[in-house]
Every structure is written in structure tokens, then in C-alpha cells.
Curated annotation (Swiss-Prot):
Domain F-box stretches: 17-63
Pfam families recorded: F-box (PF00646)
The protein, known as: Putative F-box protein At4g05620
Top-level taxonomy: Eukaryota, Viridiplantae, Streptophyta, Embryophyta, Tracheophyta
Length: 132
């Protein structure tokens, strides 16, 4: 949303107003806890608030209390035309019936990359919301 601001009789300048979430923090955490981890990488692009919440131990604790635990496997792939490897989450859809042999119940979902250099990735482990 933008609001006009007039300055000395000239054309009005447009000042952008920051949008903020109107939901209380606890409600937002509860809502995100009900969303599948498959969608977290997309949600992290929406707002900075989502990025920090998705990476927070608080969200994973809430998911655990709600019984919304999802197993996933992190996969690191290096493509020939890219200088750095890319991270994906192997998401296994539970309770899916495969209609034919061409379809697959599993998805590789892109995951935001780790900020350290690939040389330090000799051994990594994911615990809750963190990758070490």
C-alpha cells in the first residue's frame, strides 16, 4: 500500500508502507505447524518473518506437540554446469497409491543453501530445524 506525500507544491511523492502480519505470533506458529514441510521452501520466500519461523526450533516443537512429524532426507547434488552443489529435501508422500509405474510418490524439493563453503560440508546432520 502506498500513501501520497506532498512536498512544496510539486507532484506528490509516493512512500511505500511496510506490510506487517496482523496475526499474533503464537497463531502464526500454530498455522505454519499445520503446513507440510514440503511447502516450507516456498513459504520462506513470502516474508522474512516466515523464513525465521520456519527455521525456528519453536515451530518444530509445536509440530511435535501436534503430532505433525514428517520424516525427510536431505540430498546434496552437484550439477555439471553449476559451481556449487544444491540442496534438496526428499519428501516421501505417505498413503499415496501409485496409479501407474510412471508416477512416483517421492519429490525432490529445493532447500535454501547453507551459507558455508562446500569444503566444510564433509559431514552434515539435520537435527530438528537445523543442519550441522
Amino acid at each position: 500500500m502506498a500513501s501520497p506525500v506532498t512536498t512544496n507544491g510539486k507532484e506528490p511523492l509516493v512512500r511505500k508502507q511496510k506490510k506487517s502480519l496482523s496475526l499474533p505470533h503464537d497463531v502464526l506458529v500454530s498455522c505454519l505447524a499445520h503446513v507440510s514441510r514440503l511447502h516450507y521452501s516456498i513459504l520462506s520466500l513470502v516474508l522474512k518473518n516466515f523464513r525465521s519461523l520456519i527455521a525456528s526450533p519453536e515451530l518444530y516443537k509445536t509440530r511435535s506437540l501436534l503430532g505433525r512429524i514428517e520424516s525427510c532426507l536431505y540430498v546434496c547434488l552437484r550439477f555439471p554446469n553449476e559451481s556449487h552443489p544444491r540442496w534438496f529435501t526428499l519428501y516421501m508422500k505417505p498413503n499415496q497409491i501409485v496409479a501407474n509405474n510412471k508416477s512416483n510418490c517421492n519429490l525432490l524439493v529445493p532447500t535454501p543453501t547453507i551459507s558455508s563453503s562446500p569444503a566444510h560440508w564433509l559431514c552434515l546432520i539435520a537435527v530438528g530445524s537445523r543442519i550441522y
